[in-house]
Amino acid sequence: MTACLVEVGGELRAHGVRPDGLPWRVAVEVPDASGAHALAVPLRDQSIATSGDYRRYIEQAGRRYAHTLAPRTGKPLDNDLASVTVIHPECMLADGLATALGVLGAAAGADYAARHDLAALFILRGAAGHEVRATPAFAALLDRP
């Protein structure tokens, strides 16, 4: 097999290109119930993984409690991040990094990603809706043909 796009448990791995010679295109969801997409990402010989609190959570007394726990406190994360998406050559690392950057939070996660030249997309939840922030490495991937 010379080309394929494989999905396992929400993570995707692209090998080669589509039959028409173009990269595989993968949509990044807006983390709400709308089913809308924030953007489409071209993938060629890379993996993509997203970690967020918009699918697995409970709400109590108006607060959202995610399935991801903060390692220092053992409590559910409490930050403004709705999701983090990472593109990386290794699928397992993309998945682990997406979770780790989410645990760090928007500011510290973006700082870590920029220092390590990681392609990461942060979607933050705010009063006016969602805000999308991409690291320089992620933005560069969007500009590729």
Identify the residue ranges that each predicted region occupies.
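Mature catalytic core of soluble alpha/beta enzymes
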Residues: 1-145
